[in-house]
Regions:
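Conserved alpha/beta core surface patches that mediate binding of polyanionic ligands
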Residues: 48-60, 91-103, 140-165
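Conserved phosphate/anionic-ligand binding catalytic regions in large, soluble enzymes, centered on
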Residues: 61-89, 181-189, 259-285, 363-370, ...
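A structural-propensity feature for long, helix-poor, extended segments
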Residues: 100-133, 298-360, 366
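Flexible, glycine/charged-enriched surface loops at secondary-structure junctions
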Residues: 102-108, 145-158, 203-221, 264, ...
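Glycine-rich, mobile lid/loop segments that gate access to catalytic sites or pores
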Residues: 110-259
Length: 426
């Protein structure tokens, strides 16, 4: 019989599991939770402190995609994902471009944004004049929080007022842009915003006799001014395909479709983000924030479309991906998680901008490999071959039967039904 509980967070791990056993778990299934604990207690404690109410660890494969030549540097890129074919596709894309110049990147900008949302009942012109004349004092008021970041080249970049009163009475916003050096900067930005809001409220009230109502202070995960571009380029004749011009034309058209059709664009970008997320997770970055920002960026013109584009002009194939990436190489999980720390070492201890370039290039490699597969062999042929092991495991195939199935399906189409039929005959 399941029941609600008060004070669950105060229970020990053993007590939490006991409560789950009594209320939700079938007999004996709690042992699965224990199987994934680390035998090293200190190591296990690190993991348990990442989140709340922890009762076990959830493992994901940690993989390597080699042969990434990015801005002249060769990388073996760590990727964390449970999805079949993602790492294989990224690796295939990296290998293809390794001998064709690799990936060239540029950081378009690296500004991040936070916002102070407030209501104010005075005249907009008075507020605008107040902001203009007090920007320097606003920045100075936050020095206790920003001084260390400023020594690393970061800090407050701009402060501007946004007026929303035409659509929401008395509602304004202070838009504050930051540079956060090699940190993702979420905690830093939020701390500065709260400190600034206190000073702003007191100063505005003193000068105008009208007190603002601070609604909230929070960073934005939409970072259209923290953007990286990754690009690949080669002659059409350098493609291995027999009918290179025919296939590169199809390729260009496939990417173009993702520019004009939202249904295709969502799946197209999902494939690109497979690579982005996998490297973000491996390096301890917030893939959910990255996902949210990327998809908002894809719809920045009012229509959701592809994050990548492709041209074939004068016998030259060019593909590029442009996306916002607010990532860090210091602070947070990047240093707390042993594998996140190792990932950054594998990537030769990159700066945050270098990590932006790496992640964008993996996303582009992923996207290139997926589209190439779509316009040549079709997505299922490669994906289902790589997914075969998962199907066999799910159906309980023995090691010897699984081995024979792998050989059989080298020359046969893979599907769940086909695998089931094969196993039934054994």
């Amino acid at each position: 019989m399941s029941s609600s509980i008060s004070g669950f967070s105060k229970l020990s791990k053993a007590e939490k599991i006991q409560w789950l056993r009594l209320n939700y778990l079938p007999d004996g299934s709690h042992k699965i939770l224990e199987q994934f604990w680390s035998s090293d207690n200190a190591f296990q404690n690190v993991f348990e402190n990442f989140s709340e109410n922890t009762v076990s660890n959830f493992h994901l494969p940690y993989s390597i995609a080699p042969n990434f030549l990015i801005d002249g540097t060769l990388y073996a890129v760590p990727m964390v994902t449970e999805e079949s074919s993602v790492v294989a596709a990224a690796s295939a894309g990296a290998k293809f471009w390794l001998k064709r110049g690799g990936f060239k990147t540029r950081i378009i900008n690296n500004l991040k944004e936070g916002q102070i949302h407030f209501n104010w009942a005075g005249e907009a012109q008075i507020l605008e004049a107040f902001i203009r004349t007090n920007i320097e004092s606003f920045i100075s008021a936050c020095k206790n929080t920003t001084s260390r970041m400023e020594k690393r080249g970061g800090g407050i970049n701009t402060i501007t007022l946004r007026d929303f009163t035409a659509i929401e009475p008395q509602y304004y916003q202070l838009k504050v842009q930051f540079r956060t050096a090699d940190a993702m900067g979420a905690n830093f930005i939020n701390s500065v915003l709260e400190e600034l809001a206190d000073f702003f409220s007191v100063r505005l009230t003193a000068e105008t006799n009208i007190e603002p109502t601070i609604i909230m202070c929070i960073l934005s995960n939409y970072t259209p001014d923290c953007v990286v571009e990754s690009m690949v380029q080669c002659k059409v004749s350098e493609f291995d395909d027999k009918n290179a011009e025919y296939y590169t034309d199809k390729f260009q058209k496939a990417v173009r479709i993702a520019q004009i059709d939202t249904y295709r664009a969502v799946t197209h970008n999902k494939g690109l983000m497979n690579g982005v997320d996998a490297v973000a997770i491996a390096t301890g970055n917030d893939f959910r924030a990255i996902e949210a920002g990327a998809h908002a960026f894809a719809a920045r013109d009012g229509v959701y479309k592809s994050l990548s584009e492709c041209t074939v002009e004068g016998g030259v194939f060019t593909m590029r991906a442009t996306l916002p990436l607010a990532v860090g190489t210091v602070g947070g999980l990047t240093r707390l998680h042993p594998l996140a720390k190792l990932s950054l070492e594998l990537l030769q201890s990159p700066t945050s901008e270098q990590l932006m370039s790496i992640i964008a290039s993996v996303g582009l490699a992923q996207n290139f490999a997926a589209v190439r597969s779509l316009v040549t062999t079709g997505i299922q042929k490669g994906h289902m071959k790589l997914h075969l092991s998962n199907i066999l495991n799910e159906m309980g195939a023995s090691e010897s039967v699984a081995e024979s199935a792998q050989k059989y399906f080298e020359s046969h189409t893979v599907s769940v039904n086909a695998v089931r039929d094969y196993l039934n005959e054994k």
